[in-house]
Amino acid sequence: MKLFQIFPLLLSLTSVTLAADDFCNATGFQGQSVVSTGHDVKKIGNIDYEQWADGGNNSATFYSDGSFKCNFSNTKDYLCRSGVAFSQAKYPSEIGHIEAEYRLVKKSASNVGYSYVGVYGWTLQSGISGVYEYYIVDNWLSQWRPGDWVGNTKFGDFTIDGGVYTVYKNVNGNLTQYFSLRKSERTCGTIDVTAHFAQWEKLGLKMPKITEIKVLAEAGNTGGGCSGSVEIPYAKIYINGKDQDGKSKGGSSSGGSNGQGLGNGQGNGQGQGNGQGQSATGSGKCPSTITSQGYKCCSSNCDIIYRDQSGDWGVENDEWCGCGSRVPKTTNCPSSIKNQGYKCCSDSCEIVLTDSDGDWGIENDEWCGCGIKNTTPTTTTKKSNNSQPTQGQSNNNSSTNTNFCSTSKHSGQSVTETSNKVGSIGGVGYELWADSGNNSATFYSDGSFSCSFRNAKDYLCRSGLSFDSTKTYQQLGHMYADFKLVKQNIQNVDYSYVGIYGWTRNPLVEFYVVDNWLSQWRPGDWVGNKKHGDFTIDGAKYTVYENTRTGPSIDGNTTFKQYFSIRQQARDCGTIDITAHFEQWEKLGMRMGKMHEAKVLGEAGSTGSGTSGTADFPYAKVYIK
């Protein structure tokens, strides 16, 4: 089951929730206090706390009500946390239902390269193999949300306890890390920790035994020291509705003295205590769309906690199971959707977008028609052979080499540029542009090119089709690009885009389709001030961003839009369906104008002293079919 298309009946296996203003306005810092200036793992009252840092001058004050204050100066990595620790590691199912409440006040932060604020824990006694560390991140002290660099496996976006989180796994030697990163930061709230554990388990991320559950503030910088101050005036960990002092959350407990919270089947020996223990073996019925994935059916009295295209789901014994016998059926949807090659959604679909074609949902990470809506069908012209570009048509309008990933080499006439230049060779448009440094680029009449840069703050070279800004992409025809990239001696690259680049007018838009990068990390959420999400475009997953910028453009210094599609998995060679990206953007309300250019691009930059290296493109074609 793929959870990025779930239609959540949100996990509600929790106790009564306190009204937000009961702790979101808390001033905290009550009771006894202790000041820590070194690496301390200690206890105050019933509260377990820790401060840890890699260098710098740091301190933290912890209070017996769970609240704490953290101050750090010139540290490479700093964390302070407060909550619950166990003398013996326990599996989450042995602990009960876990929740955290917190309030965050950011006081100051400078030179913070990465940061996590939320719930944290780790263990040396995993009960599996190796060391495990987990993060549920609701906020951050850095300028940008943590990006895909946190993990070497990205599972996608999931609705967990009412919020959308991106889930990652990272393995570094003996250390395994799990992350849930909230898409929209918040400074106060309740985190259903058990709901995250359950989601991770469903994705195959087996939960180890854990030794702590704490509210965390962490900040660091791999390039130098960071400094700042943060306060957590409210921090509580609840297990089965009770905090460390035995006080009930909201005046009620989520599990009795004998129960074990989230359906671990223990209760007082028969799964009947005051908790929510349930049968260890399902006795109910559920559709084969669930059992064929290896999941069991729940018991007959199960509670549905969300639905997707496979059926209805519950949780028993800390594992997902099929709840009920409803078999999803494919619904009908307008021909204006089916005629574009899209399928109809299942009968449990949720409408996420409405346009002139009808209502749209998402299932299996792909768009689908969600029910019948009476509309006037619109025709989308996907191919046209009548309109041609003003430049580059004669030698670059089609791809004839089907083996370009293995047999490519530069050919034809060539020209070498050593300064900023917009030109053409053999009907192929090209450009070299750089901000400082010693740079050059060689462009060939077959469309291929080679880019060399040294100590440049920003450098780009590109080759492809140029237009006269009189026709839309629909009028020009279906646009594709083939490319092959060879990276050589890349150094000190902080950001980079390799793929397709161009501009439109009316509206003025700068656009990127990014299939690779010369930097160590994939471009992150910092590229755009609006993140539309992840979409399957031409068979691959891309994250789509939109940005509004004021600065240099093809029409001088002005305000313009930027659109990005950033591929989740980099590739060195392939075919990009450019029109498919344009169509996806327009479906999201990102309007395209009249085409000025579409070119294969290599761009690299550094926020520091400058970047150096070579990006060779032995094959590059932009063409219209």
UniProtKB/Swiss-Prot annotation:
Q: What are the boundaries of the region Disordered? A: 245-283, 379-399
Catalyzed reaction equations: Endohydrolysis of (1->4)-beta-D-xylosidic linkages in xylans
GO annotation terms (biological process): xylan catabolic process
Cite the GH11 domain residue spans from the record. 35-231, 416-617
Cited InterPro entries:
CBM10/Dockerin_dom, ConA-like_dom_sf, Dockerin_dom_fun_sf, GH11/12, GH11_AS_1, GH11_dom, Glyco_hydro_11
Q: What is its EC number?
A: 3.2.1.8
Give the domain of life.
Eukaryota
Signal peptide positions are: 1-19
* Start and stop residues of the sequence repeats: 259-268, 269-278
Listed A to Z, the keywords are:
Carbohydrate metabolism, Glycosidase, Hydrolase, Polysaccharide degradation, Repeat, Signal, Xylan degradation
> Where do the segments described as Linker lie?
255-279, 374-403
Which residues are catalytic? Answer: 510 (nucleophile), 603 (proton donor)
Q: Which is an annotated GO molecular function term of this record?
A: endo-1,4-beta-xylanase activity
What metabolic or biological pathway is this protein involved in? Glycan degradation; xylan degradation
All copies of domain CBM10, residue ranges: 285-324, 332-371
KW Cytoplasm (keyword) present: no
Residues annotated as region 2 X 10 AA tandem repeats of G-Q-G-[LQ]-G-N-G-Q-G-[NQ]? 259-278
Q: Where is the composition biased (Gly residues)?
A: 252-276
- Comment text on domains: Consists of an N- and C-terminal catalytic domains linked to a middle reiterated domain. Only the C-terminal catalytic domain is active.
**Similarity comment:** Belongs to the glycosyl hydrolase 11 (cellulase G) family.
Functionally, this protein is described as follows: Hydrolyzes 1,4-beta linked polysaccharide backbones of xylans, one of the major hemicellulose components in hardwoods and softwoods. It is more active against xylopentaose than xylotetraose, has trace activity against xylotriose. The major products released from hydrolysis of xylooligosaccharides are xylobiose and xylotriose. The reiterated 40 AA domain is involved in binding the cellulase-hemicellulase complex.
| Protein name, per record | Endo-1,4-beta-xylanase A
